Every structure is written in C-alpha cells, then in structure tokens.
Amino acid sequence: DKAEMDVADVKDQQPESMELIDVPAEVDKGTSLKDFTSTLKAKVTYADGAVKEVAASDLEFVVVPDMETVGEKYVVATLKKTLLGKTADKTISANAKFSVVAGIKSITITKAPSRTKYYFYNSAALEGVDHTLAFDPTGMEVTAKYVEGEDAVLENSKLTFSRIPATPGKHEVTITTENGRTATVEVNVAESAVKAVTPSPVSLGAEDCSTAWWTEFTENMKIPAGETFEFNFTNYTSGANNYNNYVVILRKADLAEYAVVRADNYGWGNGYAACTPIGTQGDWATWLATMNGAKVKLFVTNCNNGTADIQAIVTGTDGSVTTQSYLGINTIDPSDLNVAFTVDSSHLKFNAASARKHYSRAHRR
C-alpha cells in the first residue's frame, strides 16, 4: 500500500474503493440525516494507489431503512469525484452499521458504587502538580429514562466521570451520558496514612551492579486499601543506561502485573496506560551521572478507587533533587495490591524502617 498522498503531488485518479470512518455506534432518535452525517469521513483509495481522507461535504448519504425509527440501520455513502475533485467515470459506495436509539431524557443512580472512600498522598514530589483522582464506578448502576420506551440500565463504559481533587473532604462527581444528561454522586477523600517499610532482602542485586534484568526481586509487600508505604534506599547503577536503576513492580499476590515502572519516566503493564508519568530529570546524561549512590524516598499509595500512585524524591550524589511520579495506575484490585522492587544492572540498599514524622506536600513549610 502506498502512503497517504498530497493531491498536489499526483496526477488525477479515479476512485476505486472507500471505507467510512468516524461512524458513531448510536445516534439519538430525532437526529437529522444532515446532522448525523456532517462529521463522517471516508478513506478513499484511488486507481494508482493514492489514499485520501474525504470529508462529508464531498459525499452523498442515505440511511437504510430510515432514520425515524429505533433500531439497527445502515448508512450508505457514495462518491462521484476523482482525486482532484472532478466528476468521476464511476460512482463508488461504502456502508457502515449503526443504531438509532431512543434519546435519554434523564439518568438516575439506582445502585451506589461499591467504593466511595478514596485516599491520596501528596509528597514533595507533587509540588506544583494538580493531583486528581479517578472515579471508580465498580458496582454502580445508572438507569436511563428514555424519551420513549422502557427505562434501562446503562453500561458504565458509555458514561464519563469528572475528576476528583486530591484534597480531604466530600466531593461531587458528575456522571455524563453521550447526549449530555447528568447525575451526581458523592465520594469522600482522605489523606492516606504513611507506613515506613523495609523490604526483604535489604540489599538487592550484586554490589557491582552486574545483576541481569528480571532475575532478582524483593518480597511482595501487600499495601492495604487507603495506606501509603514509604521506602528509603540508596540506588547504585552501572551507569550504562537511564533504565539501569531502581524498578518498581505493582502486582497481585499471584504475580499478575498491574504495572512496572522505572526511574526514568517510563513503564508498562495493563494499568500503566491510564497513569500520568511526571519526571523532572531534565538532561538525561547529567541526571544519570548523579544516580550511582543517589538517595531515594519512594511512596506507593493504594487509593481504594482502583488506582495506585507512585511518587519518588531522588537526591543525587551532587545534591540535586529530582522527582519521578506515576499517578493513577489503574486496573488495581484494592484488596490485592502488592509492591516489589527489582534491578537491572543496578543495586539497591534499603534503610531500616523506623517511626518518623511524615511531611506531606500540604504540611511542608
């Protein structure tokens, strides 16, 4: 296949085939054909292989069998223009399936979510960061009242939810349907308790930083819902690559991973895509040069909303302070969140845990 081409660079070509894109799965009853099709597009392939995205204004549409009744429908688009917009020798067409649905008049929360008490911890790593929490719809049931027909329970995947400030107190979450109908639910947010923890073993990886990737690990440490574990350790690195430093693993007791995150603003796993990685390392070479012997204070919070936060404050060997956070790692089962560390041509020495006063961002002076 040839890449999508600039029409200015090619001779005129006849259309050969096309595919409709951006077709919504559902359209409210009463929507006009013009309004429905105004945002549709088609990906058109021409005789010599050129590919062009064509706007709705260059297409003609019909809906089969109609737009007036509820049910499954097909939108059929036709194109009568060449690549350069002249009348084509033949007309081509494409179709796509969608459904006309009775419009939602209002929504009501008919079953409360399972978890409405969330927790946060704002360390110094989040100075200047607008920290928010995700709403957890687990267990919630939202019922829609339609303009016509019977009431029905909506899938939570068809709803959107407002973010929640990571500040103590009661907060209102707005639940919104695709057609703009809203309802609200209240959640309570509290600052997490912090517990200093020392993993076993306290010395992880060979002292000469020769330990290979994914060969040595600390024990799994289970973080109860609503708690934050604090780890203090010295990080040693071979200095070969940015990723040859500490690595944090969030996983279930059976070792199924939620996410794996590194010291250099990078990670992966089912829960990683939803998170916000925030690193202040700046120039990588300068940062890496300070990591062999860097002091790390790292926090992991079980937010009890299906997410976890990781925050690290790193004091380099030159005295510079950088931070690394991963906020909102999701797919977390709050009753089965475990943290472990591993190394990759690196070595970690953990400090013994001791009771100490913990300063959150809000309490720093």
Where are each of the predicted segments found?
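Solvent-exposed, low-complexity, repeat-rich "mucin-like" stalks and linkers
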Residues: 14-50, 105-150
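Secretory/extracellular carbohydrate-interaction modules
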Residues: 203-273
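Short, solvent-exposed beta-strand-to-loop segments that form ligand-recognition rims
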Residues: 315-338
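Interdomain boundary/hinge segments at the C-termini of tandem beta-sandwich modules
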Residues: 5-12, 96-102, 187-191
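Short tryptophan-centered beta-strand motifs in secreted/extracellular beta-sheet-rich domains
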Residues: 293-302, 310-312
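Serine/threonine-rich, repeat-prone extracellular segments and beta-strand-based repeat modules
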Residues: 25-27, 50-85, 89-92, 149-187
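Ligand-recognition surfaces built from glycine- and aromatic
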Residues: 226, 331-365
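Short, aromatic/His-centered strand-loop micro-motif at the edge of beta-sheets
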Residues: 273-297
